[in-house]
Amino acid sequence: MPTVGCHTDDGVAGMTSSTERSARRPLLRRLGWSTLVLCASVVLLVGLGFLWFIRQVPLVEVTLTRDADGIVALTGGASRIADAIELLASGRGKRLLISGAYRATNSTAISRLNPEFERWVRCCVDFDRSLNTLGNAIETRQWAQSRGFRSLIVVTSSYHMPRAMAEIGHQLPGVALIPFPVVTDKLKAEPWWANGTTTKLLLSEYLKYIFTQVRIRFDPASGITTPAYGAWK
């Protein structure tokens, strides 16, 4: 007589497997939707944060209303150096630090920008060769502390100013920082969204700013809370 036990077992196993697959489908769908919602939320937060960051970037030159003990220029463009030396010459600060200067940047090279700069460079300008914004901030701290400065004018490009103020403020919490943003010609000429290169530059700087704020908050070397850039405006 033929046996049917094996066929019955196969049928039960097949039904069990089908039931398990059916039970897993809602779970997979829920996981898929949760992942989608999470990704959309992250994109939304980053987008809103970027728009906030854009609002912190000055689009016009500012007029200083106070002087400071010292001036620090974070290099990256000749206009920053020129503006910083003009501030020094007008008596806005006692001494200038050009931070992150290229090796070729010296009194002779700066004099080519304007011959009148030479006497100021020879008497009242210091240089350091730091390689990034954190290095700028550390060198600025050492320079300011060695001279007993309690207030600084910070000169850098407008899009770099939020990160520069965060880094320097973290290194020098007891020193008053006065931003002097240098607005690039591209930002003056057209809206940031009209130029792909400018948009990428601002987005890159925004992501670096986020990384800086996270690193500062978890910096084991200090428990200092650094205020957002807008607190200095």
Regions found by a protein language model. Give the residues of each.
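Acidic/polar hotspots within intrinsically disordered regions
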Residues: D9-D10
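A structural signal for short, hydrophobic/glycine-enriched beta-strand patches
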Residues: F53-G196
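N-terminal type II signal-anchor transmembrane helix
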Residues: T19-V62
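A transmembrane-helix-recognition feature enriched in membrane-embedded lipid enzymes
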Residues: N195-T225
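Hinge/cleft segment of the Venus flytrap/periplasmic-binding protein
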Residues: G223-K233
